[in-house]
């Protein structure tokens, strides 16, 4: 079975946005999603651990926003400044079990986040562990230049949540939902085109009786390999759409902007786009540098994300330890 891409390339960006989106705003409760929207990038379906192998990924993310938009895409909060710095570690395992024409895998990722927020003259800061991302089952398949996967994801409650705090790291609700992706590598990895689709069902925050609306993501990218060493340059992005209304105590949430206009549902929308470059590390590792810019934003912060993501086979640590 041919795998034209290093296993790192797809999973490397599969979690970073969960830490970068653990940030306050408008859409959904506190405006934040528990889900890693937009994080899927290079070879989302082609990049998985080999059978019986484990990969380790480390994510460093810095998010900067000086604007928070209302439902009309206008600035909603004066003197708004948001800074998020996050580190996340992820272990991804291919169990080597074949079923339904594919291979079975799973992964878990834990983000640690530092947030700083100033708005309308008030300032807040918080550190802690955000929502943990757990995928108990993912099924993927490689045939020629077509790679696909299906998976079921879950997000746990953020462990350090405090109802009385104006700023929290992560969300106090769990969530779950299916995802599907496809990667095309028509010239043995020289060209890569990816798409991923997620549908997220949010559970109720029992501390506030707030239920965020369900969310849909379409994540996409296209890249080209330019050197024999495997350096890849491309673009990626995502379309985010909250498809159902926010509700609190069973009633649809109503918001009012600075001009006195009311909107119902508190739904968020955004388009994200930017460049990225992948540098190979050995045969099965890589580092990704990425910049994403928020556009057409409604009921969410509008800013920029800067990422450094590194992934290597977990066995590399064992070999390094034995060599000492």
Regions found by a protein language model. Name each.
Residues 33-36, 56-64, 106-114, 150-158, ...:
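Transmembrane beta-barrel strands of outer-membrane/channel proteins
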Residues 82-138:
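Long, hydrophobic/aromatic-enriched structural stretches that serve as scaffold segments
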Residues 29-34, 62-86, 120-126:
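Surface-exposed strand-loop-strand hairpins of Gram-negative outer-membrane beta-barrel proteins
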Residues 149-257:
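Detector for outer-membrane/organellar transmembrane beta-barrel domains
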Residues 61, 69, 75-76, 208-324:
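Outer membrane beta-barrel transmembrane domains
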Residues 81-89, 126-132, 170-176, 210-218, ...:
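Residues that define the transmembrane beta-barrel architecture of outer-membrane proteins
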Residues 29, 45-53, 95-105, 119, ...:
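Short loop/turn motifs that connect adjacent beta-strands in outer-membrane beta-barrel proteins
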Residues 46, 58, 88-93, 134-140, ...:
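Residues on the lipid-exposed face of transmembrane beta-strands in outer-membrane beta-barrel proteins
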């Amino acid at each position: 079975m041919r795998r034209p891409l290093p296993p790192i390339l797809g999973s490397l960006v599969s979690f970073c946005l969960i830490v970068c989106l653990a940030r306050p705003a408008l859409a959904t409760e506190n405006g934040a999603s528990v889900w890693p929207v937009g994080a899927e990038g290079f070879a989302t379906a082609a990049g998985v651990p080999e059978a019986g192998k484990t990969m380790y990924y480390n994510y460093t993310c810095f998010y900067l926003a000086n604007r928070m938009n209302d439902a009309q895409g206008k600035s909603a909060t004066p003197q708004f400044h948001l800074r998020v710095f996050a580190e996340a570690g992820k272990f991804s395992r291919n169990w080597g079990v074949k079923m339904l024409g594919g291979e079975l895998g799973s992964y878990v990722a834990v983000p640690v986040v530092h947030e700083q927020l100033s708005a309308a003259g008030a300032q807040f800061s918080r550190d802690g562990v955000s929502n943990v991302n757990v995928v108990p089952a993912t099924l993927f398949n490689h045939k020629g230049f077509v790679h696909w996967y299906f998976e079921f994801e879950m997000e746990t409650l953020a462990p350090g949540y405090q109802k009385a705090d104006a700023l929290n790291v992560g969300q106090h609700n769990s969530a779950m939902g299916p995802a599907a992706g496809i990667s095309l590598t028509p010239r043995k990895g020289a060209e890569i085109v990816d798409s991923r689709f997620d549908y997220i069902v949010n559970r109720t925050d029992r501390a506030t009786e707030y239920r965020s609306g369900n969310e849909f993501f379409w994540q996409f990218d296209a890249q080209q390999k330019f050197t024999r060493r495997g350096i890849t340059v491309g673009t990626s992005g995502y379309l985010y759409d909250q498809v159902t209304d926010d509700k609190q105590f069973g009633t649809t949430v109503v918001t009012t902007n600075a001009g006195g206009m009311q909107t119902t549902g508190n739904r968020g929308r955004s388009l994200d786009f930017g460049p990225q470059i992948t540098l190979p590390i050995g045969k099965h590792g890589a580092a990704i540098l990425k910049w994403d810019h928020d556009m057409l934003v409604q009921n969410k912060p509008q800013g920029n994300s800067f990422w450094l993501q590194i992934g290597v086979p977990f066995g590399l640590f064992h070999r390094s330890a034995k060599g000492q």
